[in-house]
């Protein structure tokens, strides 16, 4: 996708100077004649004694041999410096191009993390593949080796042609009729991840780690053999023939587009904590915190119609109070209230273009939890109802999602309208459930609704919508 974005224009393809700008990171070998070579490259000072214009007849034979050797060393170092300069210039231009793509002026904190990841990759601290899951995903690190984000490339998704997980390839080969989810748009998982973060921020839920679309290239990503051979060939050409290598649009591996989600520390799988809370019940105030956080997860999953929400792909962070059993009676101990938070990750299988109606229903597994039987609290009503009841807010949300989704090369406007129709129906059901004081369990039992834009031959200032219920149910229904 990046073959058409030249890194070095033909006008800039002249051989570079031998001297480097400060901070380029290049170092010249300390060899005899180095100072003479730099002076000659700069075009200042008299010609060295071994230059062709010097009267060699007056030199002793030993000095002539030394001069010829120094000239040969100077030429070798000059060629090496020229290759290093060309490589540094191309690399700097490539980094600048990636940074222009990965520009997030509206979120400077997120941009700082992306810059840290880019610098780490330049320093050969590459992302590490995550072996769990059904797609190619990677822990992205900073220059200190700390995990700062999770990157999921588009072409390594479960339906991508470069998915490194052989189990999905085997499933696609042996059982194609059961492969994939026909209610989802193929190869848009990275947009679904970023879209879930967008919805989370618009609704002020604050449970999805910030996620955006980012371009990254790394040796540890899964590339085709052709891409790797082309990259090695271009690098070899740049080293051997810098004039030719400078004319390539790109030297390294092609950058991959994908979702870049900030890494959250101190969280564990919800299944771990939920089992522990069954054995060790939480205090009343802490249990109230968990319930409020759980309601935010329900709101997010229901609006985006997440088709892959189990208890193993959302996280809980529980900061237990200080254990003062080992403290003496005379010690003063600061007792703090336990803090519990929820993080909704793995949102790549959301935003369907229709409600599931084929084989599987893809239920919300949190609906079987005890927290799902408690009616929605007044706090979540005050937070969500004013927003989702406002047509202007819904319209702004749709426009923001459109600006995000249209970045995909395979974007289809008709499919996007279907995705939005499903989301409108989910918002309609959620609004009614909150007003009727229902519980999350009652919410998921409501009939699926699709709200489409009504077609009219007359122009009007406001849009009208048509509401329809889905009567067809999946073969394996869960109610």
Curated annotation (Swiss-Prot):
| GO annotation, cellular component aspect | BLOC-1 complex; cytoplasmic vesicle; dendrite; early endosome membrane; endosome; endosome membrane; glutamatergic synapse; Golgi membrane
From the UniProt entry, list the residue stretches annotated as the region Disordered.
1-58
UniProt-listed InterPro entries: Lsb6/PI4K2 (IPR039756), PI3/4_kinase_cat_dom (IPR000403)
List N-acetylmethionine occurrences by residue.
1
Q: Which UniProt keywords apply?
A: Acetylation, ATP-binding, Cell membrane, Cell projection, Cytoplasmic vesicle, Endosome, Golgi apparatus, Kinase, Lipid metabolism, Lipoprotein, Membrane, Mitochondrion, Nucleotide-binding, Palmitate, Phosphoprotein, Synapse, Synaptosome, Transferase, Ubl conjugation
Q: How is it modified after translation?
A: Palmitoylated by ZDHHC3 and ZDHHC7 in the CCPCC motif. Palmitoylation is cholesterol-dependent, and required for TGN localization.
Q: Which GO terms describe its biological process?
A: phosphatidylinositol biosynthetic process; phosphatidylinositol phosphate biosynthetic process
Domain (PI3K/PI4K catalytic): give its ranges. Answer: 124-453
Composition-biased stretches (Low complexity) = 31-45
According to its UniProt entry, the function of this protein is described as:
Membrane-bound phosphatidylinositol-4 kinase (PI4-kinase) that catalyzes the phosphorylation of phosphatidylinositol (PI) to phosphatidylinositol 4-phosphate (PI4P), a lipid that plays important roles in endocytosis, Golgi function, protein sorting and membrane trafficking and is required for prolonged survival of neurons. Besides, phosphorylation of phosphatidylinositol (PI) to phosphatidylinositol 4-phosphate (PI4P) is the first committed step in the generation of phosphatidylinositol 4,5-bisphosphate (PIP2), a precursor of the second messenger inositol 1,4,5-trisphosphate (InsP3).
Task: Tell me the protein family, please.
Answer: Belongs to the PI3/PI4-kinase family. Type II PI4K subfamily.
This protein's name: Phosphatidylinositol 4-kinase type 2-alpha
Origin species, per record, is: Mus musculus (Mouse)
Q: Which gene encodes it?
A: Pi4k2a
């Amino acid at each position: 996708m990046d073959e058409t974005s030249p890194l070095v224009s033909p006008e800039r393809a002249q051989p570079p100077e031998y001297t480097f700008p400060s901070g380029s990171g290049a170092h010249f070998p300390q060899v005899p004649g180095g100072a003479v070579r730099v002076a000659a490259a700069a075009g200042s000072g008299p010609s060295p004694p071994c230059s062709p214009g010097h009267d060699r007849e007056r030199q002793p034979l030993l000095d002539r041999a030394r001069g010829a050797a120094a000239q040969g060393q100077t030429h070798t170092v000059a060629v090496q410096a020229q290759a290093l300069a060309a490589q540094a210039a191309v690399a700097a231009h490539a980094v600048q191009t990636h940074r222009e793509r990965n520009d997030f002026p509206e979120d400077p904190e997120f941009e700082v993390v992306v810059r840290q990841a880019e610098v780490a990759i330049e320093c050969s601290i590459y992302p590490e593949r995550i072996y769990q899951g059904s797609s190619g995903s990677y822990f992205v690190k900073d220059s200190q080796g700390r995990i700062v984000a999770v990157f999921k490339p588009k072409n390594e998704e479960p339906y991508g042609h470069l998915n490194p997980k052989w189990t999905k390839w085997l499933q696609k080969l042996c059982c194609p009729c059961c492969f994939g989810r026909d209610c989802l748009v193929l190869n848009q998982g990275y947009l679904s991840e970023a879209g879930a973060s967008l919805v989370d921020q618009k609704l002020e839920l604050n449970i999805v780690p910030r996620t955006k679309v980012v371009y990254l290239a790394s040796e540890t990503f899964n590339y085709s053999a052709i891409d790797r051979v082309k990259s090695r060939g271009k690098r070899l050409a740049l080293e051997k023939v810098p004039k030719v290598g400078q004319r390539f649009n790109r030297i390294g591996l092609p950058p991959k587009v994908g979702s870049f989600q900030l890494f959250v520390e101190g969280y564990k799988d919800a299944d771990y904590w939920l089992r522990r809370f069954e054995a060790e019940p939480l205090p009343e105030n802490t249990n109230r915190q968990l319930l409020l956080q759980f309601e935010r997860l329900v709101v997010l999953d229901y609006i985006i119609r997440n088709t892959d929400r189990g208890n193993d792909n959302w996280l809980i962070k529980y900061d237990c109070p200080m254990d003062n059993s080992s403290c003496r009676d005379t010690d003063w101990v600061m007792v703090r209230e336990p803090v519990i938070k929820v993080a909704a990750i793995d949102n790549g299988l959301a935003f369907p273009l229709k409600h599931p109606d084929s084989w599987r229903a893809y239920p919300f597994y949190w609906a079987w939890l005890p927290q799902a039987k408690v009616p929605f609290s007044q706090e979540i009503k005050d937070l969500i109802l004013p927003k989702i009841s406002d047509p202007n807010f819904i319209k702004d949300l749709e426009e923001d999602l459109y600006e995000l989704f249209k970045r995909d090369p395979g974007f289809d406007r008709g499919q996007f309208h279907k995705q939005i129709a499903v989301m409108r129906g989910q918002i309609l059901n959620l609004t009614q459930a909150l007003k009727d004081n229902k519980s999350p369990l009652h919410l998921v039992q409501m009939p699926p609704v699709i709200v489409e834009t009504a077609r009219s031959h007359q122009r009007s200032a406001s849009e009208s919508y048509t509401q329809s219920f889905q009567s067809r149910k999946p073969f394996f229904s869960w109610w």
